[in-house]
């Protein structure tokens, strides 16, 4: 009945708040763990090729094809791909500047993201470890631009990265992958609750 809908909505809002708190704690755990990593300090440019790929316009996106990564993660699909292997990419333009994504194999990455390509440095760095390391990094200090926020290549090249041995990196990557899996599951559940909240709000005013 309509009288119970407000209580159902309040329950949904409470569950959303709990999930958001849990997600924040999980992300904080990754940051805390990365701050306690010990190893050699190297510049990011010493272990990765850093570049912006060719941009395609939104009108070129297709319903089928290969995933396209832009300023907001996955933004659509395209008939071709410009990276055969999975890649780390950092949003370098707009309000999501500094967001780190790990792409699927055979994807197109646009010029709104900076690629951190470690394919030629596999003996030095574990790609998944570096992804988690950068995901825990606060990029605010290198974001520039008074109108549209942006990250340019030079300060990225000079980022100091702490690298344990390659075997330790792989071990840590496994642990952080489990944390990431928990974040991803919570994110999906959170989206379901948000959808439920929006539905209940609409129903209350019918």
Where are these regions (language model features)?
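PAS-family sensory domains
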Residues: 28, 32, 178, 185, ...
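Non-catalytic DNA-recognition/assembly elements of restriction-modification systems
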Residues: 2-70, 158, 163-166, 189-190, ...
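Short, intrinsically disordered, mixed-charge
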Residues: 49, 132-139
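A short beta-sheet element
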Residues: 70-135, 144-147, 152-156
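Extracellular/lumenal glycan-associated surfaces
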Residues: 171-181
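Glutamine-centric residue-chemistry signal
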Residues: 23, 148-150, 169, 196, ...
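Proline-centric
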Residues: 1-13, 34-37, 115-124, 136-141, ...
């Amino acid at each position: 009945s309509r009288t119970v809908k407000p209580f159902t909505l309040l329950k949904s809002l409470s569950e959303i708040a709990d999930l958001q708190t849990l997600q924040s704690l999980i992300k904080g755990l990754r940051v805390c763990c990365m701050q306690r990593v010990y190893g050699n300090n190297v510049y990011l440019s010493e272990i990765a090729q850093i570049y912006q790929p060719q941009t395609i316009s939104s009108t070129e996106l297709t319903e089928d094809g290969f995933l396209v990564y832009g300023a907001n993660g996955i933004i659509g699909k395209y008939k071709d791909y410009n990276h055969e292997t999975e890649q780390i990419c950092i949003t370098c333009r707009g309000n999501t500047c500094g967001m780190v994504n790990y792409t699927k194999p055979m994807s197109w990455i646009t010029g709104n993201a900076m690629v951190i390509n470690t394919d030629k440095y596999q003996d030095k760095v574990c790609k998944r470890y570096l992804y988690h390391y950068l995901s825990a990094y606060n990029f605010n200090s290198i974001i520039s631009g008074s109108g549209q926020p942006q990250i340019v290549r030079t300060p990225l090249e000079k980022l100091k990265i702490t690298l344990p041995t390659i075997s330790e990196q792989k071990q840590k990557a496994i642990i952080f992958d489990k944390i990431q899996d928990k974040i991803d599951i919570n994110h999906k559940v959170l989206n379901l609750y948000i959808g439920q909240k929006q539905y209940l709000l609409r129903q209350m005013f019918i």
